[in-house]
Amino acid sequence: MATLKTFRTLVQLKHKLGKAYEIVGEPRLPKWFHVEYLEDPKKMYVEPTLVEIMFGKDGEHIPHVECTLHVLIHVNVWGPEKQAEILIFGPPNFQKDVAQMLSNVAHFCRMKLMEKEALEAGVERRLMAASKATTQPTPVKVRDAATQVAPVQVRDAAIQPAPVKVRDAATQVAPVQVHEVATQPVPVQVRDAATQPVPVRVRDAATQPVPVRVRDAATQPVPVRVRDAATQPVPVRVRDAATEPVPVQVRDAATQPAPVQVRDAATQPAPVQVRDAATQPAPVQVRDAATQPAPVQVRDAATQPAPVQVRDAATQPAPVQVRDAATQPAPVQVREAATQQTPVEVADDTQLVQLKAGEAFAQHTSGKVHQDVNGQSPIEVCEGATQRHSVDASEALSQKCPEDLEGGDTETSLDDSYVIIRPSRAVWEPFVML
């Protein structure tokens, strides 16, 4: 008969009658445990092998579990054939919770045990297979000889060598020879003899040389000669003879040589006057002479001091004014004297000599100059004004104001185109004293 095995616990209990248990001896009970909890314990059954897995060897973890859960756990084991009995003493709600917890722990330990048993069984099977392999050498040799060696030899002998030889002899060599003999050499010879040489010769003889010669002889040389002879030389000659030389000669003879000859003959002033008179209109000269010179002389005479004007008239302005009058066209001087009488009268006090000379020159030359301007060309007017009336002006000045010009110096240009009159010292000395 199996003996009862008990595990360690905080309070040793003994089964009394029915479901009642009693305390063995007089142990010290925990404060959270009461005696009435011994009357109706909660029972559960597990495999005996799981008891030591759950509570340790001989139940060494039971006292710690009891203190933690505030219940008493009593385990009875009657051998490996029977299931172990677990008794839970405590409040009813605690009994239910602890029983559920212990069942979960038992299930977890059961699964671990099954894995362990399966692992051990697998290891045993592998060990058995290994032992069989070591103890049975003949099957190993048979497997190596029957499965490995024979197929390898058959594949090497039947599959590889035969196809290689057949492919080399039947498929590779014969087609190569046939291809070289039937397709390559014959077409090469035919193409070289029939297709290539003949077209080359035909193209060289029929297509290339003939077009080259035709293009050189028919298309290129002829147009070149025609263009050189018909298109280029003729226009060049026509342009040189008809368009360019004639205008050049006409322009040289009509426009350029004539002024050059006139300038050479008159020593530069005459051509300038002729070109100005011929190219520019007469109204331009009238406007310039009427608007610009007269106001300048009036402003100079009215605004500048008398001594400055006398000194300028005695030393510098007198030659300048006479030279301007001699080089510029006579109509300008006549028009200045004839049209601008009022400004001249303003300068009577300061420039007496110039005023009288201007009046005399205006009286003698105004009628003649207007007649010459109306009846002659601008060139003749300028020549008549500069050459013909210079003597009249000097005579008029000497006859009109002999008392003022007496004792003064008079100079005439080489070509008698103008007269320079320098008043005597008695005339301009009173102005200098001022």
From Swiss-Prot:
> What segment(s) does the record annotate as region Involved in RNA binding?
1-39
Q: Name the InterPro entries for this protein.
A: KH_dom_type_1_sf, KHDC1, MOEP19_KH-like
Which Gene Ontology cellular-component terms appear in the entry?
A: cell cortex; centrosome; chromosome; cytoplasm; cytoplasmic lattice; mitochondrion; nucleus; protein-containing complex
Write the record's keywords in alphabetical order, separated by commas: Cell cycle, Chromosome, Cytoplasm, Cytoskeleton, Developmental protein, Mitochondrion, Nucleus, Phosphoprotein
Q: Where's the KH domain?
A: 40-118
Region Required for interaction with NUMA1 and regulation of apoptosis in response to DNA damage, residue ranges: 334-434
Q: Which residues carry this modification: Phosphothreonine?
A: T267, T279
Phosphoprotein among the record's keywords? yes
Task: Write down the CDD domains for this protein, in alphabetical order.
Answer: FILIA_N_like
Tell me the GO BP annotations in alphabetical order: actin filament organization; establishment of organelle localization; mitotic spindle assembly; mitotic spindle assembly checkpoint signaling; negative regulation of apoptotic process; positive regulation of dendrite development; positive regulation of double-strand break repair; positive regulation of double-strand break repair via homologous recombination
List the Gene Ontology MF annotations in alphabetical order.
RNA binding; structural constituent of cytoplasmic lattice
Q: What does the UniProt entry say about where the protein is found?
A: Cytoplasm; Cytoplasm, Cell cortex; Nucleus; Mitochondrion
How are the domains described in the entry?
Answer: Contains 1 atypical KH domain, which is still capable of binding RNA.
| Stated role | Component of the subcortical maternal complex (SCMC), a multiprotein complex that plays a key role in early embryonic development. The SCMC complex is a structural constituent of cytoplasmic lattices, which consist in fibrous structures found in the cytoplasm of oocytes and preimplantation embryos. They are required to store maternal proteins critical for embryonic development, such as proteins that control epigenetic reprogramming of the preimplantation embryo, and prevent their degradation or activation.
Q: How does it assemble?
A: Component of the subcortical maternal complex (SCMC), at least composed of NLRP5, KHDC3, OOEP, and TLE6. Within the complex, interacts with NLRP5, KHDC3 and TLE6. The SCMC may facilitate translocation of its components between the nuclear and cytoplasmic compartments. Forms a scaffold complex with OOEP/FLOPED, and interacts with BLM and TRIM25 at DNA replication forks. Interacts with PARP1; the interaction is increased following the formation of DNA double-strand breaks. Interacts (via C-terminus) with NUMA1.
What family is this? Answer: Belongs to the KHDC1 family.
UniProt-recorded name of the protein: KH domain-containing protein 3
Q: Could you tell me the gene encoding this protein?
A: Khdc3
